[in-house]
Amino acid sequence: MKKWSRHLLAAGALALGMSAAHASDNDTLYFYNWTEYVPPGLLEQFTKETGIKVIYSTYESNETMYAKLKTYKDGAYDLVVPSTYYVDKMRKEGMIQKIDKSKLTNFHNLDPEMLNKPFDPNNDYSVPYIWGATAIGVNSDAIDPKTITSWADLWKPEYKNSLLLTDDAREVFQMALRKLGYSGNTTDPKEIEAAYEELKKLMPNVAAFNSDNPANPYMEGEVNLGMVWNGSAFVARQAGTPLEVVWPKEGGIFWMDSLAIPANAKNKEGALKLINFLLRPDVAKEVAETIGYPTPNLAARKLLSPEVANDKSLYPDAQTISKGEWQNDVGDASAIYEEYYQKLKAGR
């Protein structure tokens, strides 16, 4: 999840409707989601339409959500929103259950291009909610975007101490692995080490790591080039910063946040109703406009303004998407990535 939006929503626990202590399993739904990921008033609308009260709480990372589900095994949550390879990880570990798509009458609204990704073939365990990508950010007032075509351009010596990288081990290594011609999902220790050695060469060019909002350093004039999330770049442009998105020839880094039902959910039927509600075009449009990231809902996209719907940084064409790579679970190799990443940052 790439967390920055036009609006700041309340974090932590938010109870909508009556207390869980006085609610039965079927008329209360426990929804655990990313901070800033639901527009104000939307869950109240769901409650008004269905009678199901939503107990809403938020998290800041997949790791936090995963640990909470591992800790509370008594069905503490009915709906969660894991990202890309966490869907893969959680389905393999039996933490999320198969979704009865016959009860999702709005499933057909989803863009076929956003379905059947490697982390969940056939979407048996997850339903796309929001997606996005990491690409190259360029301040067009300082650098001609036409001169930047590849991840390799970030290694050029003229950009010493002027780049921004996202503070994300998998993303940073995926960039280097793609530059070297390897898969960004490799589990080969030698390939990961090669990426580490390549990234060491990049460090003199790096001015900052940022995953709170990678667009901020661009907006504040601290950097003019580097990695950026396409949604935050779009919002930055709307705020007046000429932050262009360049899709590198090696391919962008794609991610998706999906709706999933924990294996021990107590209100599966309520979760399915909320998923179906969130798949409505009018609702998905509101979510996308609030968050500032692309919606996988094709019917909702048709409701967006032409300025947004036709923006190629938000909605790249099929060829650009096909060149990119979706992150998959790398199992035990994640520890190797993290070890090298910490060494990389410590050695700056």
Curated annotation (Swiss-Prot):
Gene of this entry: potD
Alphabetically ordered keywords of this record: Periplasm, Signal, Transport
Transmembrane segments: none
Reported function: Required for the activity of the bacterial periplasmic transport system of putrescine and spermidine. Polyamine binding protein.
Entry-linked SUPFAM superfamilies: Periplasmic binding protein-like II
Keyword Oxidoreductase: no
Intrachain disulfide bonds: none
Protein name: Spermidine/putrescine-binding periplasmic protein
Segment forming the signal sequence: 1-23
